Every structure is written in structure tokens, then in C-alpha cells.
A protein has these predicted regions:
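The feature captures the beta-strand-to-loop junction immediately N-terminal to the Walker
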Residues: 35-37
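Conserved ABC ATPase signature
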Residues: 123-127, 131
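Catalytic Walker B motif of ABC-type/P-loop ATPase nucleotide-binding domains
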Residues: 148-152
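H-loop (His-switch) and adjacent beta-strand-loop-beta switch element
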Residues: 197-210
Length: 252
């Protein structure tokens, strides 16, 4: 099988390389979680893959296009939700042409898939952060790109919407054979949906491989600087990770 996203000897960063050269071969249907502490370079990696930030060395090869869901989006105009999502169809619409019925259908289908069809006519700027995140995911869906990148897709979402988004990520892989890469601080999210994980470590090092092998207690302790426990709860197929720290309180 031919990879749809390949990082070869990739060095990335704003001025100097954040990590040792990175090599990844992401296959159709694989879900990659990018884990690491704040400031480790997770978002910078996605910016490099999409070309927003030039690579310092090495190369990125993406087959079938790349759709990106950024952490935040501030449109310059007072756009409605359906207009923001329609932006994702730009490469399917001829220059200066009007959107076709198929484009509009794709927009409404994507909104319905995320349970936000009722927001289609709402001004994007009036939505909560979590609602805006769902709209941006819908925008990526309608682009029909083979590779979907999501930057902290669950960061602004409540628990119910986190489940919706993680289920969607799983469906993109298993039902549509898309290649998905998402950044997250939560190792449990990686264990729930990711087939593979890239763990960004201190000292310019990284680990990559099947998620159950990478998301181990010792690796997470080294990456985050806190003790953690990986637990297998009865009745649930995926382990969960909980930090083992306590908060000091004044003596009474």
C-alpha cells in the first residue's frame, strides 16, 4: 500500500529544528495522534505539513490533498456558518463560478453529520468556541481531501462533543479510508481512536509507532514530567490514562 502522507528526514521549527529528523509513512485508513507537552511543536508540525511554515530540511509528500482544521479561525467578514463551510469546497469550484447544488448538499450533509445543521444560517462570529470548532471540522470534510489534519480538535469541546468528534475521526478512517492526523494533550484520546502515535519528547527526541506500544506509562512520564497510570476499565475496549498528582491545600 502506498502512503498518502510521507515525512522524510523532516526537520521543522521557526528558526532551528525542534527535533531529530522525522520519518513517518502514513497509510490510507491510519489515524495518527501527535502527543506532547505545551510548546513541544505539535501545531508547528501541522503548519509544516500544510506548507504554512517551510521545512528546514527534508520533505513532506501528500497524495490526494490535505484538509486542515485549525485551533481557531477568524473570518474577515460577517460570514454565516454555511458560507464558512463552503470555503472547504473551493478546489472543487471553478474560479468566479457560483456554487452548484452538489456543493450546497455537501455543506448541509457535513453540518448534519456533526449535529449542527440548525446553525447553517447563524453568523460564525456569534458561535461558542466549541461550535466554531465543529464548523471548521465540517469545512475540512466537504473538501474531500485524502489527508485530514486536526489541531487540538477537542480542546474547546464538552465531553459529549468530544465523543462526537472522536467518533467522526474513527469513521473517516474506517468508513472512508482517509488518513487522519490530530494533535492532542490527552493520551486517552490517542488510545481510543489512533492506530499510531507520534510522541514528542524532551531533548529533541520523538517516538512513533502503534499507539499501544508508544502510549506507555514510562514514555508519558518522560514526555509530560508527571507520573501517570494507564488503566484498563472493565467493559471498555480502550485503556484510559490518569495523572497521579495531588494538589496541596493549606492546613486547617
Amino acid at each position: 500500500m502506498t502512503p498518502t502522507l510521507t515525512l522524510s528526514q523532516l526537520e521543522y521549527g521557526h528558526q532551528s529544528a525542534l527535533f531529530a529528523p522525522l520519518n513517518l509513512h502514513c497509510q490510507p485508513g491510519e489515524i495518527w495522534a501527535v502527543l506532547g507537552a505545551n510548546g513541544r511543536g505539535k501545531s508547528t508540525l501541522l503548519d509544516t505539513i500544510t506548507g504554512v511554515l517551510p521545512a528546514l530540511a527534508g520533505s513532506v509528500k501528500a497524495s490526494g490533498g490535505v484538509g486542515i482544521v485549525p485551533q481557531s479561525f477568524r473570518p474577515a467578514f460577517g460570514w454565516r456558518v454555511k458560507e464558512v463551510v463552503l470555503m472547504g469546497r473551493a478546489r472543487h469550484i471553478a474560479l468566479f463560478a457560483q456554487p452548484q447544488k452538489e456543493d450546497e448538499r455537501q455543506v448541509l450533509d457535513a453540518l448534519a453529520q456533526l449535529n449542527i445543521a440548525d446553525l447553517a444560517e447563524t453568523l460564525f462570529s456569534t458561535l461558542s468556541g466549541g461550535q466554531q470548532q465543529l464548523v471548521m471540522i465540517a469545512r475540512a470534510l466537504v473538501g474531500a481531501s485524502q489527508n485530514i489534519l486536526l489541531d487540538e480538535p477537542c480542546s474547546a469541546l464538552d465531553l459529549g462533543n468530544q465523543q462526537t468528534v472522536l467518533q467522526l475521526i474513527s469513521d473517516l478512517s474506517h468508513n472512508q479510508s482517509r488518513t487522519v492526523m490530530f494533535t492532542t494533550h490527552d493520551p486517552t484520546h490517542a488510545l481510543q481512536v489512533a492506530s499510531h502515535t507520534l510522541l514528542l519528547m524532551p531533548g529533541n527526541q520523538w517516538l512513533a509507532g502503534p499507539t499501544p506500544e508508544v502510549v506507555q506509562e514510562e514514555n508519558l512520564r518522560h514526555a509530560y514530567g508527571v507520573q501517570v497510570r494507564r488503566l484498563q476499565l472493565e467493559g471498555y475496549p480502550s485503556p484510559v490514562v490518569t495523572p497521579l498528582f495531588s494538589i496541596r491545600r493549606p492546613a486547617t
